[in-house]
């Protein structure tokens, strides 16, 4: 995977924002998009200070790969373990605040409901998995970040714990909800008996090509329809085209070579081998 930031010499937060709004069908809030894109370069630098080792190019600059819906290469990545490195760095930082008692973590708890009185949220009720009791936590501000509702769609690349309970419970409690139709999903996956295993967009960012077979011939349908960068169209476009394909769709990265795959797409290779018995080097 990776994280987008306008770090290239031919790029800017303004171009980044323009690409983002265009890829989102101009539905996204322009002010929020501008703020996020403007902050992104400093976020990369902050993550570096926290210990994330981003890959470098031949000039020693943060390496940038292509991702869907972008007019510039602007996806920074840390080898084949971007997400893991970012999470590890943030957890280490959080533990510093925990050690100094600035924050307190409550482990083994699940969100049960919001604590609402007189139209205001004053905290939350949590289910203690160990004691099987409901606990009350009071707070001046409450953020419910429980991971969405991917499980409602059956097989998913997301966590099987993301069942939409929190949103449903808050709705029952009279909380106004918006934008529930926007569900994060991924167009390229490997099917397993239990769930879908994600094939990172990085595979297409490094040159992977989508195709189906017709009369014994490979049809590179994304390139046929959208040109040489067709495999890097926004996710909704790629997903619709895969869905409309007349037969099984495949993603070819074998031509990238073992060196590139091991250095940049190792996680993809391991997922395919361990969960589906597929050797991506062939």
Q: What annotation goes with each model-predicted range?
A:
Residues 2, 39-45, 49-54, 166-173:
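Hydrophobic or amphipathic alpha-helical targeting/insertion segments
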Residues 5-36:
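Glycine-rich active-site loop/strand segments that organize a redox cofactor
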Residues 28-41, 75-92, 106, 156-164, ...:
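Short beta-strand to alpha-helix junction loop
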Residues 48-133, 138, 145, 189-193:
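Conserved redox-cofactor binding core of oxidoreductases
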Residues 144-157:
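Flavin (primarily FAD) binding-site architecture
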Residues 158-171, 177:
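Thiamine diphosphate
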Residues 169, 175-281:
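An anion/pyrophosphate-binding glycine-rich loop and adjacent beta-alpha core
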């Amino acid at each position: 995977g990776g994280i987008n930031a306008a770090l290239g010499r031919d790029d800017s937060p303004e171009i980044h924002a323009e690409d983002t709004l265009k890829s989102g069908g101009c539905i996204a809030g322009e002010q929020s998009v501008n703020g996020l894109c403007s902050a992104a370069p400093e976020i990369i630098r902050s993550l570096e200070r926290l210990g994330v080792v981003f890959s470098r190019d031949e000039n020693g600059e943060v390496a940038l790969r292509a991702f869907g819906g972008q007019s510039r290469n602007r996806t920074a990545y840390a080898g084949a373990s971007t997400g893991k490195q970012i999470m590890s760095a943030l957890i280490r930082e959080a533990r510093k605040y925990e050690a100094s008692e600035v924050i307190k973590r409550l482990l083994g708890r699940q969100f049960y409901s919001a604590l609402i009185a007189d139209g205001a949220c004053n905290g939350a009720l949590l289910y203690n998995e160990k004691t099987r009791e409901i606990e009350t936590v009071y707070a001046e501000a409450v953020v419910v970040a429980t991971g969405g509702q991917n499980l409602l769609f059956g097989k998913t690349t997301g966590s099987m714990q993301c069942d939409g309970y929190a949103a449903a419970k808050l709705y029952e409690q009279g909380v106004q909800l918006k934008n529930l139709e926007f569900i994060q999903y991924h167009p390229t996956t490997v099917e397993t008996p239990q769930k879908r295993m994600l094939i990172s967009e990085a595979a297409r960012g490094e040159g992977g090509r989508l195709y189906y077979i017709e009369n014994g011939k490979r049809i590179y349908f994304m390139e046929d329809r959208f040109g040489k960068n067709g495999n890097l169209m926004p996710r909704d476009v790629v997903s619709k085209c895969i869905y409309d394909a007349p037969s099984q769709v495949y993603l070819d990265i074998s031509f990238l070579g073992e060196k590139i795959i091991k250095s940049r797409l190792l996680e993809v290779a391991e997922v395919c081998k361990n969960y589906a018995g597929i050797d991506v080097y062939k």
